[in-house]
Amino acid sequence: MNIPKSVWWLVIGMALNITGASFLWPLNTIFMKEELHKSLTIAGIVLMINSFGMVVGNLLGGSLFDKLGGYKTILIGTFTCLCSTTLLNLFHGWPWYAIWLVLLGFGGGMIVPAIYAMAGAVWPNGGRQTFNAIYLAQNIGVALG
């Protein structure tokens, strides 16, 4: 069974999204330790809260997909990420850095369920193959990041 081209675009998008996110984990830890002079414990707690923001974003992203559709949900998540990244560049002192990082996790979290749901909607006959491809893209993204 061949995966449709539209699903491949979603797989590529997921791989890029997760690669970028996982690339930032060690970079954020170094920045918080060396530039913001916070302990590794604090850096770990901030990244944990960032992950909680992602979970909340996942929940909201799934709900928004049901109400607005995939395109608008991904657009809202991407806009949230763009705003938080811009604010990270402008206000990168403590505690603003941690706040914008949590907002970045929230926005990124909104994108993930929308991609899964869009893939299922685009290729309903794909069954497990659709979701396995996206799951594999997430794993590749983490490995590359």
Describe the predicted segments one by one:
Residues K5-S51:
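Helix-loop boundary and gating motifs at the non-cytosolic
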Residues S51-L59, V142-A143:
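Residue-level signature of mid-helix packing/kink "hotspots" within the transmembrane helices
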Residues G57-G69:
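Helix-to-loop junctions at the C-terminal end of transmembrane segments
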Residues K67-T78:
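Cytoplasmic membrane-interface "Motif A"-like loop-to-helix N-cap segments
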Residues F79-H92:
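C-terminal ends and interior cores of transmembrane alpha-helices
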Residues S84, P95-L103:
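Paired small-residue
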Residues M110-W123:
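Intracellular juxtamembrane helix-capping segments at the cytosolic ends
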Residues N132-G145:
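Glycine-rich segments within core transmembrane alpha-helices of 12-TM secondary carriers
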